[in-house]
Amino acid sequence: MTKVYPLLAFFALANIAHAQDNPYSPEAKLTSDSAKTWNVGVGFTQKLLHLNAEWVNPYGIAYAKAGVFYNDDYNAGAQVGFRYPYYLTGKDKNGYYVGVYAGHIESKHINNEYEARLGAGVDLAYVLLSKERISSFSIGIGAGEKMTDQYGEVIAETEPMLQFSYTLSVGI
């Protein structure tokens, strides 16, 4: 009899069905007529001058940025991220978007050359979205990797840092 109880409990739990009414599921706020699905453009993020590609989907905007840091060495940098429309303010899908990003956040002079520093963070953006273009202003807070020189001296600590960004993209 004691061997039957675990088996009964297993079958009772295995037959429970959960409906898809999770209150934390994201809401699809963007429609296909909000903007073109694919957009390309230019912008700057901190000291990174970049080209960017953006994918508009019902749940937000995914983006990839690739460019160079404008320092003496012009080393390459890239970022990827996603922004979810949190609060929309107009008939177009203009409004406040919250997002996450990861990639190169700054360039540091280490061992007589510049090195790109990896990091990640969250941001708040105001996005002007129309069928023809996407323009976004964002401020983010994130942290980068700890960087040391060849002697083990710490050049950059892992600590919070602000990131400012502006991009302008047009639909393709």
Task: Report residues per predicted region.
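Transmembrane beta-strand segments that form the barrel wall of outer-membrane beta-barrel proteins
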Residues: 30-46, 51-53, 57-72, 96-107
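Outer-membrane beta-barrel domain signature
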Residues: 27-29, 38-42, 69-71, 109-115, ...
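Sequence/structural signature of outer-membrane beta-barrel proteins
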Residues: 49, 60, 67-73, 87-89, ...
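Short loop/turn motifs that connect adjacent beta-strands in outer-membrane beta-barrel proteins
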Residues: 21-22, 27-35, 87-96, 129-136
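Outer-membrane beta-barrel "beta-signal"
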Residues: 23, 80-82, 157-172
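Outer-membrane beta-barrel proteins
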Residues: 57-59, 83-91, 125-130, 168-172
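Cleavable N-terminal export/targeting peptides
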Residues: 1-33, 172
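Residues that define the transmembrane beta-barrel architecture of outer-membrane proteins
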Residues: 34-38, 45-49, 72-78, 94, ...
